[in-house]
């Protein structure tokens, strides 16, 4: 029998046309960057699906941010209403390096969730290189704008006016390495090909594996 908790959804926020943040009363303590497993009764995926927490540990409500990709779990979660209950696990995972070094987040789309949780909770110098298809698909817009994180946005599809903090196309990992402190710790999160590509380029740029934490998102 699975060991699950019941969490009531108390707030919903539409991040963009296909992405929803679900807030629920936090039934556990957690470390920034951890994730939970969501279970669906009757699903053939009995082990559930993992979702990173997009909230900070000190906040009263916990949250997950879900992009509707048409799969069983994303469709289910993106159709929930306030008052519905989720069956979830406790938080787990060790993505957070818990270091005093400067932190550099490299993320694509919703994979920002665990990196945002870590950077927003950090007291040291923080950087974020964030790739999304276009500005209207950016998640956590208000929170990012109000944060002290040094952010560079990269729009991979829609053409944007290149101004401070905004760029067209994909980021250059070698340039990122040159721009940030030499002792920085890197947090990389995205699809498996994205994470593998960034990891390889960090390694080629002389960044040791002990200074890189990775998390892979699988869409479902």
State where each predicted segment sits.
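Ferredoxin-reductase
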Residues: 2-84, 132-134, 157
């Amino acid at each position: 029998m699975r060991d699950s908790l019941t969490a009531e959804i108390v707030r919903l926020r539409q991040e963009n046309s296909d992405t929803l943040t679900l807030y629920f009363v936090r039934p556990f303590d957690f470390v920034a960057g951890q994730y939970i497993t969501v279970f669906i009764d009757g699903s053939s995926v009995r082990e559930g699906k993992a979702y990173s927490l997009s909230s900070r540990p000190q906040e009263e409500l916990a949250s997950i941010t879900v992009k509707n990709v048409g799969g069983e779990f994303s469709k289910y979660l993106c159709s929930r209403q306030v008052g519905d209950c989720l069956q979830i696990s406790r938080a787990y995972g060790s993505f957070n390096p818990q270091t005093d070094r400067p932190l550099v987040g490299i993320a694509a789309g919703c994979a920002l969730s665990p990196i945002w949780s870590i950077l927003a909770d950090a007291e040291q110098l923080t950087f974020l290189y964030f790739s999304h298809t276009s500005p209207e698909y950016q998640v956590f817009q208000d929170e990012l704008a109000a944060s002290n994180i040094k952010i560079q946005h990269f729009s991979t599809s829609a053409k944007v006016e290149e101004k401070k903090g905004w760029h067209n196309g994909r980021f250059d990992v070698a340039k990122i390495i040159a721009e940030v402190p030499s002792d920085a710790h890197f947090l990389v999160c995205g699809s498996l090909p994205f994470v593998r590509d960034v990891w390889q380029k960090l390694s080629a740029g002389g960044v040791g594996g002990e200074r890189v934490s990775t998390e892979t998102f699988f869409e479902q």
